[in-house]
């Protein structure tokens, strides 16, 4: 079966400290503003 990737995006990450927070919540991609 062809499996497509699933992206769990952290939206509006505006500080470096937020990266760890969102990754710990399960995000596997980061979108910055």
From Swiss-Prot:
GO terms for cellular component: extracellular region. Disulfide bonds: none annotated. The keyword Transport does not apply. Its EC number is 4.6.1.-. Keywords: Cytolysis, Dermonecrotic toxin, Disulfide bond, Hemolysis, Lipid degradation, Lipid metabolism, Lyase, Magnesium, Metal-binding, Secreted, Toxin. GO terms for biological process: killing of cells of another organism; lipid catabolic process. Its main location: secreted. Its cofactor is Mg(2+). Belongs to the arthropod phospholipase D family. Class II subfamily. This is Dermonecrotic toxin LbSicTox-alphaIB1b. It comes from Loxosceles boneti (North American fiddleback spider).
